[in-house]
Amino acid sequence: MKYFFSLPFPKVHTTCKHTAAATASQPLQKIRERLESGPGFQEFVQNPSYNREDWSAYEGKLKREKGEQDRLRLPPWLKTKIPMGKNFSRIKDQLRELKLATVCEEAKCPNIGECWGGGEHGTQTATIMLMGDTCTRGCRFCSVKTARAPPPLDPDEPKKTASAIASWGLDYIVLTSVDRDDLPDGGSNHIAETIREIKRQNPRIFVECLAPDFRGNLDCIRTVATSGLDVYAHNIETVESLTPFVRDRRAEYRQSLKCLASVKEINPNMVTKTSIMLGLGETDEQVEQTMKDLRAVGVDCLTLGQYMQPTKRHLKVIEYVTPEKFKHWETRGNELGFLYTASGPLVRSSYKAGEFFITSILKNRAAAAAEEATATKPSE
């Protein structure tokens, strides 16, 4: 005998295809509405949810422990606006047309939007990088291209640079350069010629130059220091113990100190300037000693800023230093006797915020020199 079992049929829910489509589109529509009413990309970059005067509430991780491989997340105080605007585009187009390199782009400076766009000071500027965009050294923090034999110098660069600067109508300009160890004079004559041409086209402008160490060659340093330059800058970059690890092996801590000391020997009235990066693993005691070493060789102006890893192949950030700690170093710099100390996460050696203070120093010195010359002039 055959037995037949009756099995229950599964329940099937049916809906009209138009109803199903409408139901599926509801969550999508809600997402679209949230995107339209929510913050834009610019707001994510600027991260306005934090009070930029007080970062004490920030709870993110700021320091990598020994052995950790993961990169730290960028804290909110280091997030900047996306560069844009008419001024930014105009200055970029002009530099391209003249085939001039800038440290702003090559070093991926976070302040490019403010400097090229005008920022709070209203005057746009760029830091011209002389002698091309390729360096003979390979510092582990720097994103500038490197090669043993870079292209030859452009003989028209001094005039093109001076013309661009003259068109900007500035009263202060910062020049920098790559290292050119492949040249007998390290490029010192090329730099000096550029400074002279800038002064020829605009005698009233103040010129600051962030110069190489020229392997400690005193003649090269003298060539630049006696070119009509107003501010001679050379960066110490980091503390002594980290120098072999951070900088190219040809760049030595004591050699940099000697360069800065030599400038003062050549011209005691020359304003000298240098910069220190923080966040590479240095201790407070090492930073303090570096500042004392710099004062011992007569350095006038000091800037301290946060090291930021430009690409994955460069040194990782060990620590993101807080704005409060940077403020401490600014106070300490003033106590040690620097004429000017700029210290902050986004401060860079060529950042224009310090130009106004240095300009006043130079103008006051010029006025004092003129007054002294008048006082000592024999009466007829």
Curated annotation (Swiss-Prot):
NCBIfam families in the record: lipA, PRK05481.1, PRK12928.1
Gene Ontology annotations for the cellular component aspect, listed alphabetically: mitochondrion
Disulphide-bridged cysteine pairs: none
Gene3D superfamilies: Aldolase class I
Residues involved in [4Fe-4S] cluster 1 binding: 104, 109, 115, 350
Keyword Hydrolase found: no
Further remark: This protein may be expected to contain an N-terminal transit peptide but none has been predicted.
SUPFAM superfamilies with a match to the protein in the record: Radical SAM enzymes
Enzyme Commission (EC) number: 2.8.1.8
Protein source organism: Culex quinquefasciatus
Name assigned to this protein: Lipoyl synthase, mitochondrial
